[in-house]
Amino acid sequence: MLITQLKAKEAITSLTAGKKVFIINCLGCKEVRFPEKEAARLQKELAAEGNVTGIMTTDYICNPENMELRLKKHMSKIQEADLVLVFSCGVGVQTVSEYLEDKMVCAACDTYPVPGFQGVTPLEYKCDQCGECYLNLTGGICPITACSKSLVNGQCGGSKNGKCEVDSEMECGWERIYRRLKEIGRLDALKCPTQIHNFATDDEVK
């Protein structure tokens, strides 16, 4: 199982300040604990500011076919928004980010592991369940799982022709992140102080 926990309110409002926001709630699968009441309370506060263009609540956004069908019904409201705020596990955020290529997609939750069955997703996206989601700084691409070295402070310098030096069949995660940030006009995120990975949140050391 895994648990999604809301990021600090200050962290979320710093993302939404001055922006029109479309909100996506994923109630998850049975393997995910979603903070539904806390999320609803925060979203009510955001909506009171008059900047929420719409809210979509569904499940299994990690399934691309299901997610695409749901999003199409809300596309006009999504296009009005400057930012799409996703309340889900890290896999769900990455799925939405891949589909909405021209939009800034941000995670409202951190994901933590709980011993036991981890659920099934039909996608290649991976969430390390690190409890300190980096997706808001990296354009919706997880540096922990997209980089074979799990670097969080940028490219190692060993990639060649866009491929990882550890696995020549693997695309460099940080080159993917750079391209994604450039596409959405967020290269400034690379200038943010590095969010040092706290390994004490990892399942292996608990």
Predicted region positions:
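Short, well-ordered alpha-helical microsegments
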Residues: G92-T95
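Iron-sulfur (Fe-S) cluster-binding modules
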Residues: M1-C62, L71-V84, S97-L137, I141-K206
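N-terminal glycine-rich "phosphate-gripper" loop used for MgATP/nucleotide binding
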Residues: V86-G90
